[in-house]
């Protein structure tokens, strides 16, 4: 005879699949970041950037500081970020930005264009770059 008080098996499976899915996403980020780190150009401090990205992902942090690392490119960024500081690097372009991003500091780089900016963006600092114009930014309240 089967016990009556057993919880349904699907409850545990949903949690297992959710955890597995999160682990897969984390592993995808990590493998991309390892490859990006291996392709470092002289003068870049990608090892420090990798460590900061990894800690941000593991701790589900919403703020990421990759400033002053001599970076010429960025890897794909975690989706949960709402604040990014990539100032004082040598970036000529930015990757696709997280949809929930509220603050972006990309000042003192070599940007000549910006990717599509998230509608959630409230603050942007792109001073000291090679930008001639900014796209329309309806939700931004502070521009530098």
Question: Model features per residue range: what roles?
Answer:
Residues 64-66, 84-86, 104-106, 124-126, ...:
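Conserved hydrophobic beta-strand positions in leucine-rich repeat
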Residues 1-74, 79-81:
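N-terminal capping/linker segments that flank leucine-rich repeat
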Residues 117-144:
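Ankyrin-repeat and related helical/solenoid repeat scaffolds used for protein-protein interactions
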Residues 74-77, 94-97, 114-117, 134-137:
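Canonical leucine-rich repeat
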Residues 88-92, 112-113:
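Thr-biased low-complexity repeat/linker tracts and other Thr-enriched repetitive architectures
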């Amino acid at each position: 005879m089967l016990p009556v008080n057993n919880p349904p098996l699907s409850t545990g499976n949903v949690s297992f699949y959710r955890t597995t899915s999160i682990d897969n996403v984390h592993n995808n980020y990590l493998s991309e970041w390892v490859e990006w780190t291996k392709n470092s150009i002289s003068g870049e401090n990608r090892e420090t950037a990798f460590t900061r990205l990894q800690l941000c992902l593991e701790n589900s942090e919403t703020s990421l500081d990759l400033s002053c690392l001599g970076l010429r490119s960025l890897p794909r960024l975690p989706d949960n970020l709402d604040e990014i500081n990539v100032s004082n690097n040598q970036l000529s372009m930015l990757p696709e930005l997280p949809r929930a991003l509220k603050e972006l500091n990309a000042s003192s780089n070599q940007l000549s264009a910006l990717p599509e900016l998230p509608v959630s963006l409230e603050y942007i600092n792109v001073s000291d770059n090679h930008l001639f114009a900014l796209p329309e930014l309806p939700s931004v309240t502070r521009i530098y």
